[in-house]
A protein has these predicted regions:
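Helix-loop element at the rim of GNAT/NAT acetyltransferase active sites that forms part
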Residues: 1-26
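A short helix-loop-beta-strand connector motif used in the catalytic cores of GNAT acetyltransferases and
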Residues: 30-48, 115
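Conserved beta-hairpin
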Residues: 41-61
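Conserved acyl-donor/pantetheine-binding loop and adjacent beta-alpha core of acyl/acetyltransferases
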Residues: 58-119
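Conserved GNAT acetyl-CoA-binding A-motif
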Residues: 111-114, 142-156
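Conserved acetyl-CoA-binding loop-helix of GNAT-fold acetyltransferases
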Residues: 121, 127-140, 166
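Conserved active-site alpha-helix within GNAT-family acetyltransferase domains
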Residues: 132, 144-147, 157-174, 181
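C-terminal "cap" of GNAT-fold acetyltransferases
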Residues: 149-158, 177-191
Length: 191
């Protein structure tokens, strides 16, 4: 899935050009692997679309929390996965990622919601409805969850803002991580 993020402005800034730089590619792969591991440890939703054995697109969504107990248990298990990541990514990269998380989470709505951590489609599958199908599934999941009042997400691509607005999202906050613009958006169900 790392190729799905090769032109992402945040990934380009934090990791470098993963299409041209093998070290950047290794860092992106390590980070995405960590995100998937974290998602399984915290019982987040990981959903994808396949063509036979080939993953075309996937998303990772944090669900609204009703209990802190699974997070505590997952947190202890996550530490064992975080330690190797510290040796795979530079200190600067870890600081930038931490800043990104802090800034974007502070822009999230105060009500219980699903948080779209990431959504990506392989370049050769883009424009074929894979992303739209994944978003439709996320909307169905959110509508079926009585705990959730909507969805929050962040994008660094200005052209994605209009795309998400067509799906019913509103721009909650616009900020920057150094020179990288970040658009924090929300979808509130039953408006």
């Amino acid at each position: 899935m790392s190729r799905a993020f090769s032109r992402d402005p945040l990934f380009m800034y934090v990791f470098g050009d993963s299409e041209l730089d093998s070290e950047a590619r290794k860092s992106v792969t390590a980070f995405l692997s960590f995100l998937f591991d974290k998602s399984f440890l915290f019982h987040e939703e990981v959903w994808g679309i396949f063509d036979e054995d080939s993953l075309l697109g996937t998303y990772v969504v944090e669900k609204p929390q009703t209990s802190k107990l699974p997070n505590i248990k997952g947190g202890f298990l996550l530490i064992s996965r975080l330690i190797p990541l510290v040796f795979q990514l530079s200190g600067k990269t870890l600081i930038l990622l931490n800043s990104y998380m802090r800034i974007t989470r502070s822009a999230a709505p105060p009500w219980k919601h699903h948080y779209l951590i990431m959504i990506g489609v392989k370049p050769e599958a883009q424009g074929k409805g894979v992303g739209k199908t994944m978003m439709q599934h996320l909307f169905q999941t959110t509508q079926a969850d009585p705990e959730s009042q909507g969805i929050a997400l962040d994008t660094e691509k200005e052209e994605n803002v209009a795309l998400y607005q067509k799906l019913g999202f509103t721009l909650r906050e616009q900020t920057k991580i150094d020179n990288v613009p970040v658009y924090c958006m929300v979808y509130q169900k039953n408006r």
